[in-house]
Amino acid sequence: MASGRLRPLREPTRCHRRVRQAPHGRAIDHPIAIEPTGGYEKPLLGALRAAGLPVETVHTSRFAAYRNLVGAKAKSDTSDARLLAAYAAAPDEVRGRKADHVVIAPDALREQLAELAARRNQLKHMIHAETCRLATVRNQDIRQEIAAHLEALRTAERNTHQAMMRLVRTRADLVNAKRLLQTITGVGDKTALILLALVPELGQISNKAAAALVGVAPFVRRSGTMNAPARIQGGRAPVRDAVYMAAVTASRHNRLLAPFYQRLIAAGKPPKVALVAVMRRLVVFANAVLKSAQPWKGAQLA
Protein backbone atom coordinates (compact mmCIF):
# COMPACT_ATOMS: atom_id res chain seq x y z
CA MET A 1 0.00 0.00 0.00
CA ALA A 2 1.67 3.22 -1.17
CA SER A 3 0.82 6.53 -2.86
CA GLY A 4 -2.90 5.83 -2.47
CA ARG A 5 -2.70 2.50 -4.32
CA LEU A 6 -3.54 -0.86 -2.74
CA ARG A 7 -2.01 -4.01 -4.22
CA PRO A 8 -4.37 -6.91 -3.33
CA LEU A 9 -2.82 -10.26 -2.38
CA ARG A 10 -4.62 -13.60 -2.44
CA GLU A 11 -5.08 -15.64 0.73
CA PRO A 12 -3.71 -17.93 1.94
CA THR A 13 0.00 -17.55 1.24
CA ARG A 14 3.02 -18.53 3.28
CA CYS A 15 3.78 -14.84 3.81
CA HIS A 16 0.30 -14.20 5.26
CA ARG A 17 0.54 -17.25 7.51
CA ARG A 18 3.78 -15.87 8.94
CA VAL A 19 1.96 -12.68 9.90
CA ARG A 20 -0.73 -14.67 11.70
CA GLN A 21 1.66 -16.69 13.86
CA ALA A 22 5.06 -16.17 15.40
CA PRO A 23 8.06 -17.97 13.86
CA HIS A 24 8.49 -21.57 15.06
CA GLY A 25 5.37 -21.21 17.24
CA ARG A 26 6.92 -18.62 19.54
CA ALA A 27 4.80 -15.85 21.06
CA ILE A 28 5.28 -12.31 19.77
CA ASP A 29 7.06 -10.49 22.58
CA HIS A 30 6.61 -6.94 21.25
CA PRO A 31 3.96 -5.19 19.14
CA ILE A 32 3.98 -4.96 15.38
CA ALA A 33 4.97 -1.35 14.63
CA ILE A 34 3.28 0.67 11.88
CA GLU A 35 4.33 4.14 10.76
CA PRO A 36 1.39 6.57 10.29
CA THR A 37 0.55 7.28 6.64
CA GLY A 38 -2.23 9.84 6.96
CA GLY A 39 -4.95 7.24 7.53
CA TYR A 40 -3.94 4.73 4.84
CA GLU A 41 -2.68 2.45 7.61
CA LYS A 42 -6.15 2.02 9.17
CA PRO A 43 -7.23 -1.08 7.15
CA LEU A 44 -4.00 -2.85 8.11
CA LEU A 45 -4.41 -1.86 11.76
CA GLY A 46 -7.95 -3.26 11.75
CA ALA A 47 -6.88 -6.52 10.10
CA LEU A 48 -4.03 -7.08 12.57
CA ARG A 49 -6.28 -6.35 15.55
CA ALA A 50 -8.96 -8.68 14.17
CA ALA A 51 -6.31 -11.40 13.94
CA GLY A 52 -5.53 -10.85 17.64
CA LEU A 53 -2.01 -9.56 17.00
CA PRO A 54 -0.42 -6.81 19.12
CA VAL A 55 0.03 -3.70 17.00
CA GLU A 56 0.89 -0.05 17.59
CA THR A 57 1.20 3.10 15.51
CA VAL A 58 4.57 4.67 16.23
CA HIS A 59 5.08 8.30 17.23
CA THR A 60 6.46 9.90 14.05
CA SER A 61 8.89 12.40 15.58
CA ARG A 62 10.18 9.86 18.11
CA PHE A 63 10.76 7.33 15.36
CA ALA A 64 12.65 9.98 13.37
CA ALA A 65 14.78 10.69 16.45
CA TYR A 66 15.44 6.94 16.83
CA ARG A 67 16.55 6.79 13.19
CA ASN A 68 19.10 9.53 13.91
CA LEU A 69 20.14 7.85 17.16
CA VAL A 70 21.10 4.58 15.45
CA GLY A 71 22.63 6.43 12.50
CA ALA A 72 20.37 4.92 9.84
CA LYS A 73 21.06 6.64 6.52
CA ALA A 74 19.42 4.28 4.03
CA LYS A 75 15.77 4.83 3.12
CA SER A 76 13.87 1.94 1.53
CA ASP A 77 10.83 -0.19 2.33
CA THR A 78 13.06 -3.02 3.55
CA SER A 79 15.33 -0.86 5.71
CA ASP A 80 12.31 0.99 7.14
CA ALA A 81 10.66 -2.32 8.06
CA ARG A 82 13.81 -3.49 9.85
CA LEU A 83 14.11 -0.18 11.66
CA LEU A 84 10.44 -0.26 12.74
CA ALA A 85 10.90 -3.77 14.12
CA ALA A 86 13.98 -2.68 16.06
CA TYR A 87 12.15 0.39 17.35
CA ALA A 88 9.20 -1.71 18.56
CA ALA A 89 11.57 -3.99 20.48
CA ALA A 90 13.64 -1.13 21.97
CA PRO A 91 13.25 -0.23 25.68
CA ASP A 92 11.07 2.75 26.60
CA GLU A 93 13.98 5.06 27.45
CA VAL A 94 15.45 4.56 23.97
CA ARG A 95 12.05 5.21 22.39
CA GLY A 96 11.67 8.46 24.33
CA ARG A 97 8.68 7.08 26.19
CA LYS A 98 8.02 7.48 29.91
CA ALA A 99 8.07 4.32 32.01
CA ASP A 100 4.55 5.11 33.29
CA HIS A 101 3.07 5.71 29.83
CA VAL A 102 -0.48 4.54 29.20
CA VAL A 103 -1.42 2.32 26.27
CA ILE A 104 -4.99 3.03 25.18
CA ALA A 105 -6.96 -0.04 24.16
CA PRO A 106 -8.63 0.10 20.72
CA ASP A 107 -12.10 1.61 20.93
CA ALA A 108 -14.14 1.60 17.71
CA LEU A 109 -16.64 4.16 18.98
CA ARG A 110 -13.96 6.62 20.08
CA GLU A 111 -12.25 6.18 16.70
CA GLN A 112 -15.52 7.16 15.01
CA LEU A 113 -15.76 10.13 17.36
CA ALA A 114 -12.19 11.16 16.48
CA GLU A 115 -12.97 11.02 12.75
CA LEU A 116 -16.03 13.20 13.26
CA ALA A 117 -13.96 15.64 15.34
CA ALA A 118 -11.36 15.82 12.57
CA ARG A 119 -14.09 16.45 10.00
CA ARG A 120 -15.64 19.21 12.09
CA ASN A 121 -12.20 20.82 12.38
CA GLN A 122 -11.77 20.66 8.59
CA LEU A 123 -15.17 22.28 8.09
CA LYS A 124 -14.28 25.02 10.58
CA HIS A 125 -11.13 25.88 8.60
CA MET A 126 -13.03 25.82 5.29
CA ILE A 127 -15.66 28.17 6.72
CA HIS A 128 -12.94 30.56 7.87
CA ALA A 129 -11.24 30.48 4.45
CA GLU A 130 -14.48 31.11 2.55
CA THR A 131 -15.48 33.91 4.95
CA CYS A 132 -12.15 35.64 4.25
CA ARG A 133 -12.67 35.26 0.50
CA LEU A 134 -16.18 36.68 0.73
CA ALA A 135 -14.79 39.81 2.40
CA THR A 136 -12.52 40.60 -0.56
CA VAL A 137 -14.51 39.48 -3.62
CA ARG A 138 -16.61 42.08 -5.47
CA ASN A 139 -17.99 40.01 -8.35
CA GLN A 140 -21.63 39.31 -7.46
CA ASP A 141 -21.76 35.88 -9.11
CA ILE A 142 -18.71 34.74 -7.15
CA ARG A 143 -20.10 36.26 -3.94
CA GLN A 144 -23.34 34.31 -4.38
CA GLU A 145 -21.39 31.12 -5.03
CA ILE A 146 -19.25 31.62 -1.90
CA ALA A 147 -22.31 32.50 0.19
CA ALA A 148 -24.06 29.30 -0.94
CA HIS A 149 -20.95 27.28 -0.21
CA LEU A 150 -20.69 28.86 3.25
CA GLU A 151 -24.29 27.93 4.03
CA ALA A 152 -23.62 24.33 2.97
CA LEU A 153 -20.44 24.21 5.08
CA ARG A 154 -22.21 25.59 8.16
CA THR A 155 -24.99 23.04 7.73
CA ALA A 156 -22.40 20.27 7.44
CA GLU A 157 -20.64 21.52 10.57
CA ARG A 158 -23.90 21.51 12.55
CA ASN A 159 -24.73 18.02 11.28
CA THR A 160 -21.27 16.75 12.24
CA HIS A 161 -21.64 18.20 15.72
CA GLN A 162 -25.04 16.53 16.11
CA ALA A 163 -23.57 13.23 14.90
CA MET A 164 -20.90 13.48 17.61
CA MET A 165 -23.57 14.17 20.23
CA ARG A 166 -25.63 11.17 19.08
CA LEU A 167 -22.55 8.93 19.18
CA VAL A 168 -21.69 9.97 22.74
CA ARG A 169 -25.27 9.30 23.87
CA THR A 170 -24.95 5.66 22.81
CA ARG A 171 -22.54 4.91 25.66
CA ALA A 172 -23.10 5.62 29.34
CA ASP A 173 -19.40 6.09 30.18
CA LEU A 174 -19.03 8.81 27.54
CA VAL A 175 -22.25 10.51 28.64
CA ASN A 176 -20.95 10.61 32.22
CA ALA A 177 -17.48 11.80 31.15
CA LYS A 178 -19.00 14.63 29.10
CA ARG A 179 -21.20 15.63 32.03
CA LEU A 180 -18.18 15.74 34.36
CA LEU A 181 -16.13 17.83 31.94
CA GLN A 182 -18.93 20.35 31.59
CA THR A 183 -19.02 20.96 35.34
CA ILE A 184 -15.84 23.01 34.69
CA THR A 185 -16.90 26.59 33.99
CA GLY A 186 -15.69 27.44 30.49
CA VAL A 187 -15.91 23.92 29.07
CA GLY A 188 -18.91 23.63 26.77
CA ASP A 189 -20.27 21.00 24.40
CA LYS A 190 -17.64 21.45 21.70
CA THR A 191 -14.62 21.44 24.01
CA ALA A 192 -15.92 18.43 25.95
CA LEU A 193 -16.47 16.48 22.71
CA ILE A 194 -12.97 17.32 21.45
CA LEU A 195 -11.40 16.17 24.73
CA LEU A 196 -13.35 12.90 24.66
CA ALA A 197 -12.54 12.27 21.00
CA LEU A 198 -8.90 13.29 20.78
CA VAL A 199 -7.49 12.81 24.30
CA PRO A 200 -8.71 9.35 25.40
CA GLU A 201 -5.78 9.24 27.85
CA LEU A 202 -7.44 11.84 30.12
CA GLY A 203 -8.22 10.40 33.54
CA GLN A 204 -5.51 7.74 33.25
CA ILE A 205 -2.36 9.90 33.22
CA SER A 206 -0.64 12.48 35.42
CA ASN A 207 -1.46 16.17 35.19
CA LYS A 208 1.97 16.90 33.71
CA ALA A 209 1.48 14.26 31.03
CA ALA A 210 -1.99 15.62 30.22
CA ALA A 211 -0.63 19.15 29.79
CA ALA A 212 2.18 17.86 27.55
CA LEU A 213 -0.26 15.83 25.42
CA VAL A 214 -2.37 18.89 24.70
CA GLY A 215 0.72 21.05 24.20
CA VAL A 216 0.25 23.54 27.05
CA ALA A 217 3.22 22.45 29.18
CA PRO A 218 6.02 25.06 29.20
CA PHE A 219 9.47 23.61 28.52
CA VAL A 220 12.49 25.41 29.99
CA ARG A 221 15.30 26.63 27.73
CA ARG A 222 18.36 27.10 29.90
CA SER A 223 21.90 26.23 28.94
CA GLY A 224 25.08 27.87 30.17
CA THR A 225 24.49 31.61 30.23
CA MET A 226 21.28 31.33 28.20
CA ASN A 227 18.09 31.71 30.21
CA ALA A 228 15.34 32.04 27.61
CA PRO A 229 11.64 32.11 28.52
CA ALA A 230 9.95 28.71 28.71
CA ARG A 231 7.81 27.90 25.68
CA ILE A 232 5.07 25.43 24.88
CA GLN A 233 5.64 23.06 21.98
CA GLY A 234 4.23 19.94 20.39
CA GLY A 235 0.94 18.46 21.52
CA ARG A 236 -2.37 17.95 19.74
CA ALA A 237 -3.16 21.17 17.90
CA PRO A 238 -6.95 20.66 17.42
CA VAL A 239 -7.34 20.03 21.15
CA ARG A 240 -5.22 23.06 22.00
CA ASP A 241 -7.39 25.24 19.73
CA ALA A 242 -10.54 24.06 21.52
CA VAL A 243 -9.04 24.56 24.98
CA TYR A 244 -7.89 28.05 23.95
CA MET A 245 -11.49 29.11 23.30
CA ALA A 246 -12.56 27.54 26.60
CA ALA A 247 -9.76 29.45 28.36
CA VAL A 248 -10.98 32.77 26.93
CA THR A 249 -14.38 32.12 28.52
CA ALA A 250 -12.86 30.79 31.76
CA SER A 251 -10.56 33.83 32.12
CA ARG A 252 -13.69 36.00 32.30
CA HIS A 253 -16.34 33.87 34.00
CA ASN A 254 -14.68 31.07 35.99
CA ARG A 255 -14.68 31.98 39.70
CA LEU A 256 -11.23 30.41 40.20
CA LEU A 257 -9.53 31.04 36.89
CA ALA A 258 -10.66 34.63 36.29
CA PRO A 259 -8.84 35.92 39.43
CA PHE A 260 -5.87 33.67 38.56
CA TYR A 261 -5.69 35.26 35.11
CA GLN A 262 -5.90 38.78 36.56
CA ARG A 263 -3.12 38.02 39.07
CA LEU A 264 -0.83 36.95 36.24
CA ILE A 265 -1.63 40.11 34.26
CA ALA A 266 -0.99 42.26 37.35
CA ALA A 267 2.37 40.51 37.78
CA GLY A 268 3.38 41.68 34.31
CA LYS A 269 2.75 38.50 32.33
CA PRO A 270 1.73 39.05 28.68
CA PRO A 271 -1.97 38.24 28.08
CA LYS A 272 -1.16 35.25 25.83
CA VAL A 273 1.17 33.78 28.48
CA ALA A 274 -1.53 34.23 31.14
CA LEU A 275 -4.08 32.61 28.84
CA VAL A 276 -1.82 29.59 28.26
CA ALA A 277 -1.56 29.23 32.05
CA VAL A 278 -5.37 29.18 32.20
CA MET A 279 -5.40 26.56 29.43
CA ARG A 280 -3.05 24.38 31.44
CA ARG A 281 -5.28 24.69 34.53
CA LEU A 282 -8.31 23.68 32.44
CA VAL A 283 -6.52 20.56 31.16
CA VAL A 284 -5.49 19.67 34.72
CA PHE A 285 -9.09 20.13 35.91
CA ALA A 286 -10.37 17.94 33.05
CA ASN A 287 -7.87 15.21 33.90
CA ALA A 288 -8.79 15.41 37.59
CA VAL A 289 -12.57 15.15 37.15
CA LEU A 290 -12.24 12.12 34.86
CA LYS A 291 -9.71 10.45 37.15
CA SER A 292 -11.82 10.97 40.29
CA ALA A 293 -15.18 10.50 38.52
CA GLN A 294 -16.38 13.48 40.58
CA PRO A 295 -17.67 16.89 39.42
CA TRP A 296 -15.24 19.79 39.41
CA LYS A 297 -14.89 21.09 42.97
CA GLY A 298 -14.76 24.67 41.77
CA ALA A 299 -18.31 24.25 40.48
CA GLN A 300 -19.47 24.81 44.06
CA LEU A 301 -18.16 28.39 43.78
CA ALA A 302 -19.53 29.05 40.29
Regions found by a protein language model. Name each.
Residues 1, 84, 193-194:
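Gly/Thr-rich phosphate-binding beta-strand-loop-beta motif of the actin/hexokinase/Hsp70
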Residues 1-14:
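Short glycine-rich, Thr/Ser-proximal phosphate-binding strand/loop in the N-terminal lobe
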Residues 13-31:
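Short, basic/hydrophobic alpha-helical segments
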Residues 28-40:
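Short glycine-rich phosphate-binding loop at a beta-alpha junction
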Residues 46-50, 56-183:
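Long, charge-rich intrinsically disordered scaffolds of nucleic-acid metabolism proteins
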Residues 189, 194-267, 271, 298:
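Phosphate-backbone recognition surface of nucleic-acid-processing proteins
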Residues 266-302:
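Basic, amphipathic alpha-helical segments enriched in Lys/Arg and hydrophobic/aromatic residues
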